[in-house]
């Protein structure tokens, strides 16, 4: 059994992904980060029987923790990874946290006059800019971090780029999906230095999770 200093640190995001990833870890290794962390104010919990330490952090920060070596392994949405590319090893699509980054605009809105740059409200500044640039559309990107769906109705933007699971919030705010930008799911990411320092232990972890993902997929079919 590894000592405390030898535990592999896994950064798991708070919220929905914590619950979904916990089911995979429980299937793969018999440990649930959600159960270890719930009922406590601590943001870290050890599972020495599995050789792991789990830390619960904001979803948008997981990639930074792993890239800079504060955690060896993490779970990150593909939207985060493509918005700000990182030097990380991405060995596995976990098949959880499925959503879509979309372009949406008010239902029934008239097309903008030719040559007028659309005002695009979004938290995905890079994804949105690249998407419109690839279409040859000079868009004005307006950075927002919440309540993005109301931006068109308040006259702040002509369209939005946002992430959605069911589209219900979009419809409730009078928006319709115009385009899909990126299909998103959670990815397992690994620090590249850690991969060289602990190749066998990380290989076993990756393969255990790969088997759990395959089993979950087989059950869903």
From Swiss-Prot:
Pfam families: HisG (PF01634)
Keywords: Amino-acid biosynthesis, ATP-binding, Cytoplasm, Glycosyltransferase, Histidine biosynthesis, Nucleotide-binding, Transferase
EC numbers, comma separated: 2.4.2.17
Classification via Gene3D superfamilies: Periplasmic binding protein-like II
Major localization class: cytoplasm
Comment block on domains: Lacks the C-terminal regulatory region which is replaced by HisZ.
UniProt similarity note: Belongs to the ATP phosphoribosyltransferase family. Short subfamily.
Stored NCBIfam families: hisG (TIGR00070)
Task of the protein: Catalyzes the condensation of ATP and 5-phosphoribose 1-diphosphate to form N'-(5'-phosphoribosyl)-ATP (PR-ATP). Has a crucial role in the pathway because the rate of histidine biosynthesis seems to be controlled primarily by regulation of HisG enzymatic activity.
Subunit architecture: Heteromultimer composed of HisG and HisZ subunits.
Protein name in the entry: ATP phosphoribosyltransferase
Organism of derivation: Anaeromyxobacter sp. (strain K)
Name of the gene encoding the protein in the UniProt record: hisG
